[in-house]
Design a protein with these regions (language model features):
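N-terminal non-catalytic accessory region
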Residues: 1-262, 268-287
Length: 287
């Protein structure tokens, strides 16, 4: 039997999902298949290490420095990074002032948003639609990745991790059974002792256990933070972003109550502060 046409499933603002099919030549007798996302969404939130979040200047500080742009810290912007070498100590202090900087988020309302956030380019997989193989259009993959915060972190360092999480977590099972590399090859995870990866103990993941978590969508988000400030302050900002992410999926009619947090380096300290009642106070929304 011929493989069916897999249609891209679109999620609308009211939460409904739809797909559009086109007419084909009469010789093409393949059917069309629309894959609907699960009703449950469990966002995966990545928090980077120190200096791993891109920062921008406030309008006032940009004016004081007479800069042509508002970049404070963006290592992947090579010319701006090189220019920092030739700044005086006083200028560098003004550029990296915790009170005059904030996370450089992707804003669709900015006319040059895509150009500014071009550090995220050539994303190989993103599961924002219901297609078995992810979003087909390259530009749409990049745009959706930026909307998920991938461009507010150092993508050259974290891009592989974000794409691996997005791909692996959203391609775990098909027809209730482990898919592809979950079940075979160098990256096999099912029936592999965790000691193979350096764990002290623990039992191997079974196909049955994997099947119990396949009925969810795992959209991967990155949340940058102002690493010039205290981790306690950063945790409060990250907590607010997490609640916004949960609200976003709830508005799309998904069952979404908590997120999974993945951290790197100092992001782990932010993560600890995130669930501390005196700082992020987000223990109720972190799995």
């Amino acid at each position: 039997m011929s493989e069916p046409h897999i249609l891209e499933t679109r999620i609308h603002a009211n939460g409904t999902q739809s797909a559009q099919a086109s007419s084909t030549p009469t010789a093409d007798q393949r059917g069309c298949e629309m894959r609907v996302l699960p009703n449950r969404a469990i966002p995966v939130v990545f928090i980077p290490g120190i200096m791993g979040s891109n920062l921008k200047l406030t309008a006032k500080r940009r004016s004081e420095l007479d800069k042509s742009n508002n970049i404070s810290w963006r290592p992947e912007a090579a010319m701006d990074s090189l220019a920092m070498v030739f700044k005086s100590p006083a200028q560098r202090q003004m550029m990296l002032d915790p009170e005059a900087t904030e996370v450089d988020r992707y804003d669709l309302n900015e006319s040059e948003a895509n150009k500014r956030h071009k550090n995220v380019s050539g994303v190989s997989y993103i599961h924002v639609h219901g297609s078995k193989n992810g979003v087909v259009n390259k530009d749409e993959r990049d745009r959706q990745a930026r909307l998920k915060g991938w461009s507010e972190v150092m993508f050259s360092s974290y891009g592989d991790l974000l794409q691996t999480l997005e791909s692996r977590l959203n391609q775990m099972c098909e027809d209730g059974k482990p898919r592809g590399s979950w079940n075979s090859g160098k990256r096999q995870a099912v029936d592999v002792p965790p000691q193979n990866w350096g764990a002290a103990d623990g039992e191997a993941l079974s196909a049955e256990e994997l099947g119990t978590v396949c009925d969810a969508w795992y959209p991967v988000h990155a949340i940058g933070y102002n690493w010039l400030r205290s981790n306690g302050e950063a945790a409060k900002d990250v907590a607010q972003r997490i609640r916004e992410i949960i609200a976003f999926y709830k508005n799309l009619k998904f069952d979404c109550g908590k997120v999974i947090v993945v951290t790197h380096s100092m992001g782990g300290l932010v993560g600890r502060a995130l669930i501390h009642p005196d700082y992020g106070n987000a223990q109720d929304v972190v799995a």
